[in-house]
Amino acid sequence: SGIDFVGRLDIGQGFGKAKLIVLGQAKCEGLNTPTGGTHIARTVAKLKRGWLGVYVTTSYFSAPVQVEILDDKYPLLLINGLMIAQSVIEIMLTHGYEDIDSYLHEIDTLYEGLVRHRAPEEILLD
C-alpha cells in the first residue's frame, strides 16, 4: 500500500478531543543521497482530508522537496536522519541504556507485541 505505519494523534480532551489519523512512510536511504519528491508525492497522495502524514528518512530532504512541502502546504512532517539520531540519543540517556545495542535489542524484543495490522480508519475506534 506504500504506507509503513499508521498512528493516531489525540489532541484535547473530553468533548474537545480530536483524533487524527497519521500515515507514515519510512525509508532507509544512503546518507549522501537526498530524499526526492517521488516518494514524498506517493505519501501525500495517500492522505485523505484531515489526515496527517509523516515521512521518515535516514538521509536528508533535498531543498526542492522542502520548498514544495511548504509552498503546497502539505500536511506532512519531515523527519531526517539527524533528527532520528538525536531522538535515539535522548531516549538512551533518559532511560539509562548503556549502549545502542542494548537499546536496539529492547526495541526488537518489544516490536512484535506492539504492532497491529489494521486499516487507518480502524485506529479511530480505540
Across the structure, where does each feature detected by a protein language model lie?
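Mixed-charge (Asp/Glu-Lys/Arg
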Residues: 1-126
